[in-house]
Curated annotation (Swiss-Prot):
GO terms for molecular function: GTP binding; GTPase activity; translation elongation factor activity. Catalyzes the GTP-dependent ribosomal translocation step during translation elongation. During this step, the ribosome changes from the pre-translocational (PRE) to the post-translocational (POST) state as the newly formed A-site-bound peptidyl-tRNA and P-site-bound deacylated tRNA move to the P and E sites, respectively. Catalyzes the coordinated movement of the two tRNA molecules, the mRNA and conformational changes in the ribosome. The gene is fusA. This is Elongation factor G. It comes from Rhodospirillum rubrum (strain ATCC 11170 / ATH 1.1.1 / DSM 467 / LMG 4362 / NCIMB 8255 / S1). It is found in: Cytoplasm. It comes from the Bacteria. One of its GO terms (cellular component) is cytoplasm. The lineage of its organism: Bacteria, Pseudomonadati, Pseudomonadota, Alphaproteobacteria, Rhodospirillales.
Amino acid sequence: MKRETPLDRYRNIGIMAHIDAGKTTTTERILCYTGKSHKIGEVHDGAATMDWMEQEQERGITITSAATTAFWRENRVNIIDTPGHVDFTIEVERSLRVLDGAIAVFDSVAGVEPQSETVWRQADKYKVPRMCFVNKMDRIGADFYRCVDMIIDRLGAVPLVINLPIGSESDYAGVIDLIKMKAVIWHSEDLGAHFDYVDIPAEYAEKAAEYREKLLETAVEMDDAAMEAYLEGVEPDEETLKKCIRKGTIAMKFVPVLNGSSFKNKGVQPMLDAVVDFLPSPLDVPAIHGLIPETHEDVIRGCSDDEPFSALAFKIMNDPFVGSLTFARVYSGTVESGSYVQNTVKDKRERIGRMLLMHANNREEIKWAGAGDIVAIVGLKDTTTGDTLSDTIKPVILERMEFPEPVIEVAVEPKTKADVEKMGMALARLAAEDPSFRVASDSESGQTVIKGMGELHLEILVDRMKREFKVECSVGAPQVAYRETISKVFTVDYVHKKQSGGSGQFAKVSITFSPLPPGSGYQFESKIVGGSVPKEYIPGVEKGLKSAIDTGVIAGFPVTDMKASLIDGGYHDVDSSVLAFEIAARAAFREGLPKAGPKLLEPIMKVEVVTPEDYMGDVIGDLNSRRGNILGMDQRGNARVIGAMVPLANMFGYVNTLRSMSQGRAQYTMHFDHYSEVPNNVSEEIRAKMAG
């Protein structure tokens, strides 16, 4: 089948920002001006096209990244709308993995906020070229130039200003295009669909000339011929200038910065032009690397329809009409509905049922997809987030995404008998959609425990169970996911024998437990030489230890940052078995760990509080009382920003305390930073609580 749009006219982009910077409204306007959305949906009245889950419309924040396709100047723009709330950074990470470029949206009043920094760092990790859109220029306190300074100070980026605002706050009238050196004024009567190029107002001429010079000086560095001509006093023409800006943006030398007000319908079209002119197509980004499953050889798959098929599943969503939808980015080759592909991570064949092109909440069925496409596939049985789908004859595994460990857990109990079965199914579905959400059952109490990235994260998942799956459940108080580790090296010898007539059990093990640096997790190695423990019994030792580390010796929390080395052992020709070695390893763990200096670890959160000066003393005092360690204070506009490291255990309900302390004027964000040792007095309290 022939492609409708050539690959160099594709743009796979994400819109990323802090909560409330106006990301969903911006996406809405893009869909409106590209002819994909006929009525402008406002987040203000809970009707945005991209926010299609009920809770999103109610809370006015975006939770799931809906993928949608729009067309602009004969280019096909696939947009992934990403959530800006810190509890959903996993969604952002997931969508950045499959994008070629991104638009960072900033609030012109607040500037670069904490979550913007987090997302920016994630985009750096995946080497995603990006541009910035300074939004909400019509708000009181809007300051475009301060925002540009913050992009330098906070993000360490090189901003390249492409257009300047004309006026600000209620006087915001339009922008000055520094490439064309014209002013752009929008018509308000047709919701900003049309605009005029006019001469730059006299009072802005000097500012425009200054920024035009900065633009030229930075951009021409990307092209030797343009640079030489510029040094001789010849300015590049519009096309050459755009080429230079594009080259530098894709090479991540600088980030183009534009401004506008999506809500007031100003500045969106120049931003779309910039997406097409400056952000990369699938052909401009490096080809994807993968491994051949059997040989683990490195292989490169270029972005072309002629290469073998490969795609990455980056999101699973449950749709009320068609069931489970798998969103996938096709990196190479083509695929047709009805064909078979290989899930190389699970080693299972999957049949591609129907394929859909999504537009926020309506869809178009397609029969064929090629390299560069982002599609939703119906009917995949075994595929979860992060899996690779590939050609059955030439399989490949693309690099997997890494997902953070959950830091908070709550117990959930179904309210009625009928809810028991439904809850199991609902939780399984939600866990398949979201890899940072885990479900476990507590072996002692028999309760179902759900784990996630924050209070809001779990609250929304419980809410979805109620709405989508009609499951009523009661939720316990949030619990902290503590861990245990050891502080010194200890070797334990253990003999397990059981003789009671008939065949007995015998296993002898010598295991060294040694501490590892923070964040290393648990490791097992066998140092057996000379067959003191036969090869076939070593998996038994590994299995026994693996099951034992889930329950530490201090208060029954999982053990981490520890290495267990099997150094010696003994066996009996008749009585030894894998099971005997499993039991011996478990007992060795129980005996050895208390002597290896066990310690309790707790999750430490990085907290940033933005508060008016008047409440600063109260906020700092309160953070100190929560065992917080103040990292520093900054001035942001007329507010103070306090950075601190605080144990998660002391942060429950903080939002209400902060609200009442500052009369609702202070805000905070927090995300997991690291695990740290619990002080002795607190450790004793936790032990007593667990024992009681």
